[in-house]
């Protein structure tokens, strides 16, 4: 829904640079979607290094990266159609709720959602499977048909792990092969 690649890449580059790595030598495209700690753990050996990189990323994302987002074409019209149909809509993102909420507000999408589901800052919920599981605890979903829509493999795997049907979209960052 949200084209966040410019801000995400900017923040990965910032964090890698602060940690002494050359960001131009790192393909960050595979880190669009997965949890931050997992992404940084691919490059740093210790938990302390991973946590420091996450901190650099988050500070820069809050100040700069979160404002470098835009909507993919057609998203607002799609959201209008879904809302007009009376569908319950929730997010299930690996971004922390505290991070995604201001982005949704800035992009004018916040009011479309009945529930903002996201990761927690303290790591207690930090992967797609757990985020979806948390969203599914909403009593308003009891007895409802649910469809997980996503653009990355972890979206599809999170749906499978929660025994949900899923629809892959290609307007985001995943490829047909990845799905």
Sequence positions of predicted segments:
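Surface-exposed amphipathic alpha-helices with a cationic face
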Residues: 76-84, 136, 156-161
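Conserved H-loop
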Residues: 22, 110-114, 142
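Structural signature of beta-strand start/N-cap positions in the alpha/beta core
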Residues: 80-81, 85-88, 145, 165
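Conserved phosphate-coupling serine/threonine residues in phosphotransfer and NTP-handling enzymes
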Residues: 93-95
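N-terminal helical cap/lid subdomain that shapes the substrate entry/recognition surface
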Residues: 2-77, 81, 85, 98-101
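Conserved Lys-Pro-Asp/Glu-containing loop-to-beta segment of HAD-superfamily phosphomonoesterases
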Residues: 127-157
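Acidic, Mg2+-coordinating phosphoryl-transfer loop and its flanking beta/alpha structural elements
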Residues: 147-179
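A short, structured active-site edge motif that brings together acidic residues
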Residues: 27-28, 110-125
């Amino acid at each position: 829904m949200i084209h966040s690649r410019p801000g995400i890449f900017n923040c990965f580059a910032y964090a890698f640079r602060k940690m002494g790595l050359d960001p131009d030598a790192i393909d960050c495209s595979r880190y669009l979607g997965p949890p931050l700690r997992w992404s940084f753990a691919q490059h740093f050996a210790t938990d302390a290094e991973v946590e420091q990189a996450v901190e650099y990323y988050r500070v820069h994302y809050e100040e700069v990266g979160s404002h470098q987002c835009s909507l993919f074409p057609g998203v607002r019209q799609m959201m209008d159609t879904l809302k007009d149909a009376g569908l319950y809509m929730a997010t299930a993102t690996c971004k922390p709720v505290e991070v995604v909420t201001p982005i949704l507000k800035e992009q004018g999408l916040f009011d479309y959602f009945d529930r903002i589901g996201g990761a927690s800052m303290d790591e207690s919920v930090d992967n797609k499977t757990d985020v979806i599981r948390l969203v599914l605890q909403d009593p308003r979903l009891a007895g409802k048909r649910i469809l997980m829509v996503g653009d990355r493999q972890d979206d599809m795997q999170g749906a499978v792990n929660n025994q949900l049907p899923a629809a892959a979209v290609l307007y985001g960052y995943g490829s047909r092969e990845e799905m």
